[in-house]
């Protein structure tokens, strides 16, 4: 379980948002809402250990994620995946190579066929062997989402995953996220639009809103 307890973030001697607390369990999806500039990205980065909090704490399965608990930090790193505005793809590699390379540096064995299936799910199999530098922003995002789908992460933390996608890709993403949650995964995401996650002919995933309020 992920627990966020009274987290605050200060920029220029002023808090970005009021202290925020929530928890996220297996099989749940949380939608982090808030006005532009309120600090949604900053909060996600704090949760993922990419930026420090100015107050409060983040816990994973009851253990605080800080320097005094390196084992808890390592366990959290192994079980979560963050996708921000910077997709962290390598432009000199092809789409399929990006998936295989990411698995390799993470110490995971990703079969070529499984990587190709992930690209096909996101409609990228026809561009699997093209270098990222020639792809559109939407195609790069679909590649990143395909990469996400083959991680072993239980917790997905996604910052605006629905931007730069066409209607067909949005439908594929909704199914991907619904599958993850319904199979016991955890999802925390931001979006400026109303979102529904469901499988074809399946039950919609309950999405719990968390609103970030300016301090």
Task: Briefly describe each language-model feature range.
Residues 48:
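Helix-to-loop junction immediately C-terminal to a conserved catalytic motif
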Residues 145, 184:
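Hydrophobic anchor residue at the start of the ABC signature
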Residues 156-160:
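Catalytic Walker B motif of ABC-type/P-loop ATPase nucleotide-binding domains
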Residues 86, 91-106:
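Q-loop/switch helix immediately C-terminal to the Walker
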Residues 131-138:
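Conserved ABC ATPase signature
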Residues 56-68, 76:
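Conserved ABC transporter NBD signature motif
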